[in-house]
Regions:
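Positively charged n-region of N-terminal signal peptides that target proteins for export
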Residues: 1-4
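Hydrophobic h-region of N-terminal signal peptides that target proteins for export
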Residues: 8-17
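Short S/T/G/P-rich N-terminal loop/turn motif that feeds into the first structured element of a domain
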Residues: 17-113, 118-252
Length: 252
């Protein structure tokens, strides 16, 4: 999967419907930054985890600035090309105010102090909006997460807001049957470009590796073929890549 989307697809791309159109749900969104890179020679995940300890100590020294930031370190596992990168460092914040307040602290103080000791060389950094469809059981610190990103295309006659509403309906039914997957629709504000014909990226993630299997079994047993499943339309996804990693920091 070529990781994520083009600048042209920001929020406005999904508000292509007429202003008078009424939708069932208000979009719940958050900002996320993806730092995608490879380890420096002789370095590995253990070194990055140790470096995170320095970062966390620095972040905690900044008062409440980073209280609303989560951090996860994800390693590619199922992928068509594992040579493209070793790791993704993912931060989430509720919105741009929290994101850019923290970013200013990082570039003016944190980066000069910690940048040289970072054991990773980043080859791509993405600034994204994520539309929250459903949430997993937990994202608390220490959670071993399983996350799958897939390229998705809209079908003719559908826009992102329509798809979001249908996906929310589906997720609500799935949760009533015991589903615990988190789901997000991702668009990039800057830093990435999608292949032609790809409109957004879908993230599906669970609070443990085993939980992903439990949810897959539940889908085939109780959800596939249901009215809610049949009503989920307007897009298709392919070219998925899966990651395993740990939640290092959750919202306070």
């Amino acid at each position: 999967m070529r990781i994520f989307l083009s600048l042209a697809l920001l929020f406005s791309f999904s508000v292509m419907a007429q202003e008078s159109t009424e939708y069932k749900y208000e979009v719940e969104s958050n900002k996320a930054e993806y730092y995608i890179g490879s380890y420096k020679e002789g370095k590995d995940l253990e070194d990055l985890t140790a470096w995170y300890g320095k970062f966390a100590e620095w972040a905690d020294s900044k008062g409440s600035t980073f209280d609303k930031m989560s951090v996860a370190i994800l390693t590619p596992y199922f992928s068509s090309d594992l040579s493209t990168h070793d790791v993704m460092w993912v931060t989430n914040t509720p919105g741009p105010l929290e994101q850019f307040t923290g970013l200013q602290e990082w570039v003016t103080d944190g980066l000069p102090k910690l940048g040289k000791s970072l054991p990773v060389i980043n080859t791509q950094v993405l600034d994204t909006w994520q539309w929250v469809v459903s949430s997993p059981t937990t994202t608390e610190e220490g959670t071993l997460m399983y996350a799958t990103y897939a390229d998705c295309s809209l079908e003719d006659g559908y826009n992102m807001r329509q798809v979001y509403d249908m996906y929310k309906d589906f997720a609500g039914f799935a949760q009533s049957q015991g589903d615990t997957l988190g789901r997000k629709l991702i668009v990039v504000e800057s830093g990435g470009q999608l292949d032609e014909g790809v409109d957004f990226v879908r993230l599906m993630y669970s609070s443990s590796v085993m939980e992903r299997g439990t949810n897959a079994a539940l889908y085939y047993d109780k959800i596939e073929g249901s009215e809610a499943s049949n009503n989920l339309k307007g897009f298709s996804c392919s070219n998925a890549s899966s990651y395993i990693g740990q939640s290092m920091r959750d919202y306070k």
